[in-house]
């Protein structure tokens, strides 16, 4: 039963209704390696989970031509918009995976592939009965440990305080991750501001930044 469900999810994940040279194809039998992501091998690789309209990764890709950016996004309208922006800027260091990363993550990529992973404003699922749907949990931290090398970085942002506090506790319990300086930041300069983040700031919402370094595999 579990195997049948997994096969069905892989089938859904592979069912993209349009094609693009900027797509990567996930496979249940072969993990993606840095040698087959782009036409060349980059110095470092950056993964954005839930890339939305692509503005964050595209801004960073323009500034960091020696880094390969992989975007995981499941919504077709956002993917189409991102592709148009990639083409507009003639970027050769951005690729997209149309895969729900809550279904498949470490199953898709080889170990230690990414030096940085970004997760911006995932659904906080505020109601207690929905907490099990939250992306960041102990299993997710294990996935980060697989995909990041030692000293690899994870960037996270949310505007929901209880979720931020829960994640801080998860990282404390893990022991594998360490804050760079402080456990919680109110500003972050390493990552461009997304449309969603700007909107929340304009609404007067507090943004919680939780950035961690992998110190123990």
Curated annotation (Swiss-Prot):
Pfam families in the cross-refs: Methyltransf_4
Decide whether keyword tRNA processing is in the record.
yes
Q: Which residues bind substrate?
A: 127, 159
Keyword list (alphabetical) reads: Methyltransferase, S-adenosyl-L-methionine, Transferase, tRNA processing
For this record, the Gene Ontology CC terms, alphabetical, are: tRNA methyltransferase complex
SUPFAM superfamilies membership: S-adenosyl-L-methionine-dependent methyltransferases
Instruction: Give the family, as the similarity comment puts it.
Output: Belongs to the class I-like SAM-binding methyltransferase superfamily. TrmB family.
Note the HAMAP family from the entry: tRNA_methyltr_TrmB (MF_01057)
Q: What is this protein called?
A: tRNA (guanine-N(7)-)-methyltransferase
| Record lineage | Bacteria, Pseudomonadati, Spirochaetota, Spirochaetia, Leptospirales
Gene designation? trmB
